[in-house]
Amino acid sequence: MKELASNKEWKKWGESDPLFGVASWNNKNKDGSNPWTNEDFYQLGESDWRDFRTHWERYGLSSNDSCLEIGCGAGRITKQLALYFKEVHAVDVSEKMIEYAKTHVTSSSVSFHVSTGVNIPLNDQSVNSVFSTHVFQHLDTLDIARNYFKEISRVLKRNGTMMIHLPIYKWPSSSRGFKQLYAIRKQLSDVRASMRRSLMEFGLGKPIMRGLWYPVDFFYEEFPKLGFDDIEISMFVTKSNNDPHPFVLARKG
């Protein structure tokens, strides 16, 4: 099978600048005026996980026995998952990212796995929880995403829950004005990404990951087919950078 374009892009970040690839804040690249230090990078993970965990527990995080993290990167959140869950399986398509994560996430409760970005290298019904942030927004297509959710359903135990961060449009219960602003933001983001990607073909500009947006109908149409129920879409602001983060949460029936 031909390697996914998103895999190739992510592997470049793993080779060139793992921390900035995960958290692309202004001037935080390794050659920037204020590059990430390991201390600051992993403290960011601690702050964000507190916000994520609060909303996951409010939804109904079913167990702290085991968790699959999809797209662990350099281990920003993995480090915190290891303090909460008894067993953590962290997967990523980049061997370089995993090598970096292993250096800084040394808990014996964590197992790292290199994945294809298509299949999850775990047995059926082997984890109680699944978490992912800033990963599904970079997948190639909705068909790839659909297959990945099918894989999540396969490895997730019954009554297990997932919390997945991804960009969503056509919000079900937001005002017309909010929907219009969100649609404009989406269009501008798509145009900017396309322009930057075109410049890269001529050796200009900085690398940029592709962006995939999810129509809200996708979850309500596809998830029940995969055995998920209690579907909830939530957006909240994280304290680390005051940015809104949309998540979809669901339970394996």
What are these regions (language model features)?
Residues 1-60, 67, 74-81, 85, ...:
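Class I (Rossmann-like) S-adenosyl-L-methionine-dependent methyltransferase catalytic domain
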Residues 65, 86, 128:
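Conserved acidic residues
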Residues 118-130:
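A short acidic, Gly/Pro-enriched loop at the edge of an enzyme's catalytic core
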Residues 146-158:
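A short glycine-rich, Lys/Arg-flanked "PGG" loop and its adjoining helix->strand segment in the class I
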Residues 136, 140, 148, 168, ...:
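Flexible, active-site-proximal loop/turn residues at the rims of small-molecule/cofactor binding pockets
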